[in-house]
Regions:
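Substrate/ligand-engaging "lid" and interaction regions
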Residues: 1-486
Length: 486
């Protein structure tokens, strides 16, 4: 079968000498996000410098994970990324992979050997939150997790990413080799800390001396990653094939925007990703707060008020100038003042970029999807900034309307009288309140949900007054009119 390797393509394949690449990074979890993000940054570095940092890709799960590794090997580890902008799509053939491994093909031993090679300097991960096998309540490693139990009983034939890392570090220590850096690239807050807790938890359960060696010799930098990469569908793959002239089963589509902020804390060298747009910083937390409040906060605002206003996607809300203006004002006038950013951070440029991303019609990010699980998202995205304004006397009318929009949305009926499919772990509580209360009484009852509003906000007369007024306006005038009046 013809592949992207042996076809005439409308886009250039990597032109550098592939033999110069060394597998200096072993990456666990070769999913769509990694292929559109870290592997792409590494590709651009190879393209523009004489870097030799290549990636040894590892997938651990059976099924699709194995099929992807096999498909990559059939096309010399090349694959396509389609960056879909509002006006046009740019295709790139990515060539940063040096090897691709899977336990069913290469055995556990093959993967552990790759991780224990002298040149392996970084082991990176995109294994999703559940891949860290943490106990939800304590945040510590869950020793009852079936994968972790297996890895404690069979340490040299692990199944979890954490098990592979601990055993590979044991092998390096035994051989007298320098440790590697463990770099999480998952979209999890303080992801380096999450990875460290998991690795040390398993090492401690296996051998306290090994845990002490890891604590002393391994670093776990935090990273903040941002790029919208929808899961590949048959339609996406066909669309890319039509543009490419050949079918690529490993292709993925994403938005043009990408961001990567990395804590500069490596034990064994690192690529100069900052030469191709990444940022190395001393502390990632301010950037996580920036993303949480400016991006996620305005996303929630647009999701509730957009859905109520009859808009299906975030891009649809951006066709209304009042919504565009409100989202930008929320970011710059109400969220930006709550942040403590390093000198030289241009929040105005960031907000402008976010509006551009929100306006991209090819992404089809549904307002209903972003509105899910509001009880879990509201505190960090909208309520914490409100608390800072209440302390410092700032203006927060957009935040008040955002909170009121969430309250109106949880009524479960839209402005046309149609049912809203509210998806939230606290849905039963909302339904109970909806059956008993309306108007200002309903606001008061919702504010009594201490899991969301804690004890301080319901006691604050300014907060209660502003949110109640915004809610009553929404019920009387509708979302579009209220957003236009901001």
């Amino acid at each position: 079968m013809t592949t992207i390797v042996d076809s005439n393509l409308p886009v250039a394949r990597p032109s550098w000498d592939h033999s110069r690449l060394e597998s200096r990074i072993v990456h666990l979890g070769c999913g769509a996000f990694h292929r559109a993000h870290q592997a792409l940054y590494t590709h651009h570095l190879l393209e523009s410098t004489d870097s030799d940092w290549g990636i040894c890709e590892v997938n651990l799960m059976p099924g699709n994970d194995r099929v992807l590794i096999e498909n990559l090997k059939k096309q010399q580890l090349l694959y396509t990324v389609a960056e879909k902008g509002a006006e046009s799509t740019e295709l790139k053939i990515i060539g940063s992979m040096k090897e691709a491994l899977h336990p069913e093909i290469d055995g556990c031993e093959g993967i552990l050997n790759a991780m224990a090679r002298p040149q392996t300097a970084i082991v990176s991960l995109t294994v999703t939150e559940k891949g860290y096998c943490a106990d939800a309540a304590s945040g510590q490693l869950d020793l009852n997790n079936p994968l972790i139990k297996h890895d404690l009983e069979n340490p040299t034939a692990p199944k979890s990413a954490i098990g592979y890392i601990v055993e590979a570090l044991r092998l390096r220590r035994e051989k007298g080799l320098k440790a590697f850096t463990v770099m999480s690239c998952d979209n999890v807050r303080e992801n380096g800390h999450v990875a460290k807790v998991a690795v040390l938890g398993l090492a401690q359960a296996r051998d306290p001396q090994l845990a002490a060696w890891i604590e002393e010799n391994v670093t776990f930098p935090c990273t903040m990653v941002d790029r919208i990469v929808p899961a590949a569908t048959p339609e996406t793959l066909q669309e890319i094939a039509d543009q490419l002239g050949v079918y690529d089963p490993c292709a993925i589509a994403c938005e043009p925007f990408r961001q990567w902020v990395i804590e500069d804390n490596f034990v064994n060298g690192r690529p100069d990703w900052d030469k191709v747009g990444a940022q190395f910083v001393a502390d990632v937390v301010p950037f996580e707060m920036m993303k949480l409040r400016m991006l996620n906060g305005s996303h929630s605002f647009l999701a509730y008020l957009g859905y109520l206003g009859g808009y299906e996607t975030i891009a649809d809300t951006m066709t209304n100038p009042a919504y565009r203006k409100a989202a930008f004002s929320l970011m710059m006038q109400e969220q930006a003042p709550t942040l403590s950013m390093p000198e030289g951070t241009d929040l105005n440029a960031y907000a402008t970029l976010l509006i551009e991303r929100f306006s991209n019609p090819s992404l089809r990010h549904r307002t209903w999807q972003i509105a899910m699980d509001g009880s879990q998202k509201l505190p960090q995205r909208l309520l914490d900034p409100v608390r800072l304004h209440l302390q410092n006397g700032g203006n927060w009318r957009h935040l008040a309307l955002g909170v009121a929009g969430w309250m109106r949305y949880t009524q479960g009926v839209d402005e046309q009288g149609n049912a809203i499919d509210v998806v939230d772990p606290m849905l039963a509580e909302f339904q109970k309140i909806n059956a008993q209360y309306q108007g200002a009484d309903r606001v008061k009852a919702l504010l009594g949900l201490s899991g969301i509003f804690a004890d301080d906000l319901p006691q604050n007369a300014d907060f209660v007054g502003a949110v109640t007024a915004a809610y009553q306006q929404l019920c009387e005038r509708g979302a579009r009119e209220c957003v236009a009046a901001l």
